[in-house]
Amino acid sequence: LINKNAACLEDKYRQLVDSLENQGVEVVIPGNGQTESDNIWYEEFLAMKILIDFVDNVEEAIDRINTYSGGHSTAILTENNETATEFMEQVDSAAVYHNASTRFTDGGQMGVGAELAISTDKLHHRGPLGLEQLVTNKYYVYGDGHIRD
């Protein structure tokens, strides 16, 4: 989800799409004939595929994510710490990231050891699941463009 009011939106958007497509990522944009309904928002792609849409503000992004997300991990890329804090506190995901890749949502990376499974449920544990996770947790991860290879 991209804020419609972002500075230099057209140039940054075109650069993003070109970069993704050059890496072999299929870019899906609602409303341009690629998707017939809102059902695509519920789909987990499990492929080099991304869904891009625009929102008016962070509140709309939070609402969209909380409506359609599976609750595993969610990230925001912004230099505005207030916006990031609001996003991270309001998004209903097991792990929330500010300027870091969601690929860090892994048992070894989160310090719980080898994963037995992944849970997005709120009863007992959400996120990477190890033997000691018997309470609900929400992980807050802050970065500066960090990725995981």
Language-model features and meaning:
Residues 1-101:
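NAD(P)-dependent aldehyde/semialdehyde dehydrogenase
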Residues 79-149:
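C-terminal segments
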